[in-house]
């Protein structure tokens, strides 16, 4: 009997991927990993989030993260999910200071990253979560704002459309709920447990991700006979 090997997805990103702010269940990515573990032939998920990472640092570790997680000899993961960009939106020193990575450099770097990642495996990209401007600055030096977050998420979408990469916008979906501020940690930047649950529920039902995973959409009728 041949061994059925489930597909492997690596998720590259920042503290959101790490699950910071969710002591209950370890974040949206960990929730997805556990959810898939409970499914027959569910994909294997590697959450690879590093606190503080922006686009450039994620790009710098792309090759190494992919190359060592094939599990079997000469194998690679079958998918890459990028969840990055929020840290790049922060303005340094004051509310109108320079961004950590200016929009033009962000877009160019993202285009390069998508091209490199597509040479390794199918790629998907996740949008950005909201921030609470009223409690800024973060760590007394970084100013996050909704206008900046909205601008950078639009750049994510632009690059994904150009590269024909599936993209799941998050910002407006989360902001549409009147309770969205209650989904943030006191620092105004990181999602709390409920915020991570909200993102998990959206990612879990993402049609592009379900197609990649060869999983039947939730609520869809069974095709078995």
PLM feature spans:
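Serine-esterase "nucleophile elbow" of acetyl-processing enzymes
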Residues: 1-51, 56-57, 63-75, 80
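Alpha-helical cap/lid subdomain in secreted, periplasmic
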Residues: 59-225
């Amino acid at each position: 009997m041949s061994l059925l090997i489930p597909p492997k997805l690596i998720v590259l990103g920042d503290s959101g991927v790490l699950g910071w702010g969710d002591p209950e269940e370890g974040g949206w990515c960990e929730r997805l990993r556990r959810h898939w573990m409970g499914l027959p032939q569910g994909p294997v998920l590697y959450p690879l989030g590093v606190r503080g990472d922006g686009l450039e640092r994620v790009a710098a570790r792309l090759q190494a993260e992919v190359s060592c997680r094939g599990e079997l000899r000469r194998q690679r993961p079958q998918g890459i999910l990028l969840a990055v960009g929020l840290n790049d939106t922060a303005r340094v020193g004051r509310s109108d200071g320079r961004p950590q990575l200016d929009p033009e450099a962000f877009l160019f770097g993202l285009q390069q990253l998508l091209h490199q990642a597509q040479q390794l495996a199918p790629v998907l990209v996740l949008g950005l979560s909201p921030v609470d401007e009223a409690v800024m600055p973060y760590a007394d030096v970084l100013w996050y704002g909704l206008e900046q977050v909205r601008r950078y998420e639009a750049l994510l979408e632009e690059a994904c459309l150009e590269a024909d990469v599936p993209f799941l916008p998050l910002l407006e979906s989360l902001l549409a709920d009147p309770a969205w501020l209650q989904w943030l940690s006191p620092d105004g930047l990181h999602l709390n447990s409920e915020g991570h649950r909200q993102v998990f529920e959206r990612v879990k039902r993402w049609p592009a991700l379900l197609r990649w995973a060869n999983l039947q959409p939730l609520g869809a009728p069974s095709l078995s006979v």
